[in-house]
Amino acid sequence: MSTPRIGLKASFVVGFDGTQHVLWRHGEVVFEGGKILFVGRGFPGEVNQWIDYGHALIGPGFIDLDALGDLDSTVLTLDNGAEWNMGRVWSEEYLRAGPNECYSAEEELFKYRYAFTQLIRNGITTAMPITSMYYRRWAEHYDEFAGVAALSGELGLRTYLGPCYMSGMTYARADGSAAQHWDEAAGLAGLREAERFFRDYDGAHNGLVRGALLPDRIETCTPALLERTAAVQNELNAPLRLHCCQSRYEVELVRRLRDTSSLQWLDSYGLLNPRSVLPHGILHSGEHELQRLADTGASLVHCPVVFAREGDALDSFGAYRARGINLAMGTDTFPADMLDNLRQGLNIARVQEGDAEHTRMLDLYNAATLGGAQALGRDDLGRLAVGARADITVFRLGAFHQGPFFDPLKNLFTAGRGDDCIASFIDGRSVMQDGQVIGVDYADLQRRADALFQKQMQHHAERAFGNPPWRTLFRSAIPFADSYSAAAPLLDAPTH
């Protein structure tokens, strides 16, 4: 049976002219299978099905290179004091007792189902997921990622996957100071599992799943682990993501242990290269460090929302871009709303730069599309052009919360939301229509997530000093009025 040829229409289409995004009025996109055949107006050929989305913006799907694959704990840490005091960071006594898994294997996979659904719902079509290792016994494993790969194929999300591996873990001493626990053998074993996963799953599900090397963060790596990672990356030509330059603790630890900066240490192993993507790049030792990033071709993944919540910011998006550094985007935290990250990223950049000239909204939009594609070495993603993969999103326009209409991107940047995405096609497959991710029961997914989040909160008590009652670890935004309110279940029992 032949593959149907599908045509999409809308009042606006973001095309690509070979150099830049361009806007088509009353535009059309035609694709067959997973490949785009036409972008413009007045397609002359035959089409099996036309879908007219009316007053909407058809554009390329967003690329999220630090995509939340977790039940995000930010809602617990927000305005809750030191993370070591609430059991998010491992306590020394928890480490000595022996860490354990917060979730079962089935629950781990459910986390990804919930998170991947959120990504698709918000217009993200390519994701490189991230989860927290604080809730794990030690990193991630091959078998669970075989399940994540199958889930990607089921939901239709394009993913870059691999089990996270690490040789160290940060923990808290009783006085609140941070220290490192090392397990070199576990780190190297994890890398072997990651290499095996890459060889077995790179290109799986008709190319929807690609492999990647995803060590946890630079301060949890040892020289031996980075040296071997570099060798594997070179052998496999694999994308590598490594969190670095993101905290003062990391910068100081790397300087103390390795007698160099984070970026210099990576560069010494050849890990600053065009196949390397680096969240977050907040801290560096000077302009020469930025030039090092530009010269090596490594990409920086900008995650503005998660850092702004903690009072920190990239300084600045425009300055990094002016240096010639390729910038991609990541959501990193909940919600998986790329529009919110673009909007806040623009505002933060302008505050940092002191004007409205160095960074434009199109620069952020490019980072979430073309920049992400460049970071992955994919000139067939992040754009709607003949020959590109049919990763297409549709955002409604004219919604009441968007205000009076002037320009599709400007209205979405100023007042749009992730759930303004009403349809998504990934590799030509319809994965969401009318805001509904196909095959997903949102209410059931939310019910199960709420139950699992309860388990996550209780696990904090195991990791905290003295194993206190879990509810004593978290503060509500407003003090409870009485003891009944403080002790009542967080969620009411469902009514039928």
Question: Where in this protein do the model-derived segments appear?
Answer:
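Active-site gating loops and adjacent loop-to-helix segments of metal-dependent hydrolytic enzymes
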Residues: 76-108, 137, 168-187, 248-275, ...
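C-terminal cap of metal-dependent C-N hydrolases
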Residues: 15-17, 390-446
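Histidine/acidic-residue-rich catalytic or RNA/ligand-binding cores of hydrolases
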Residues: 171, 248-260, 287-294, 311-320, ...
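Metal-coordinating catalytic core of metallo-dependent amide/deamination hydrolases
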Residues: 138-279, 288-289
